[in-house]
Amino acid sequence: MRVLIVKTSSMGDVLHTLPALTDAQQAIPGIKFDWVVEEGFAQIPSWHAAVERVIPVAIRRWRKAWFSAPIKAERKAFREALQAENYDAVIDAQGLVKSAALVTRLAHGVKHGMDWQTAREPLASLFYNRKHHIAKQQHAVERTRELFAKSLGYSKPQTQGDYAIAQHFLTNLPTDAGEYAVFLHATTRDDKHWPEEHWRELIGLLADSGIRIKLPWGAPHEEERAKRLAEGFAYVEVLPKMSLEGVARVLAGAKFVVSVDTGLSHLTAALDRPNITVYGPTDPGLIGGYGKNQMVCRAPGNELSQLTANAVK
């Protein structure tokens, strides 16, 4: 059986889809998946053993120059790659009109998705041949597991979902695995940042622990923040620029992780590493860290400036 997954973004949403593949793999021996995903997250599906082909899409980039000759050529190549296979099922786990119209609609196969009442954008359900009612008041991982089970005809396991990607990194862990912590200090929204003085206070509290601290970053302003956090602490290392797979490998070897609400926090959960995630204005209830040893630290009054380092430690 060959199935196409449409789950293009974001990082957390893509990661939250992985346990559903593990369920399907256990229920249907030999099942294989192709996966349409935004180019920036294209490494993630390849870490799961059930994924045979990753089809990158670049809707975010294309829409900036949709009708330019280079973008039209890329869109044509994507459509040809998408339509090269006739699928036993196409599962749209995104639930958005944009991805349903630009991706799911074009694929060959019976199209499954959430119904009008439960899709993230109800209009997206108009593009599906089979519409499934998936209750909203459950974690995003469980919603996707239920969607896959109903689409492919098996009972959703009652056990906790298994991302099944940690083993991808076990054969090539960093040489100092288990001897360091990773602090994920960067996120996209200003109100989700934990103040730098609190990060530095937490770093200071670990001075006598014997644990080194590694600080990854993605954008130049994040590198500057990492350098400010590390200043004066010999046991703190600002990492070089890394690919997503490189960051994942560092996370896989961490003794523990402390993070703000960010996609890499979900990656930490997917890698089964102990993680404390600090939350301010966002509610972790239905979209927070899912997995083993995932701890939530809520800020008083949902204001991260009020969350002290001692409360996190």
Where are these regions (language model features)?
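Catalytic machinery of carbohydrate-active enzymes
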Residues: 1-313
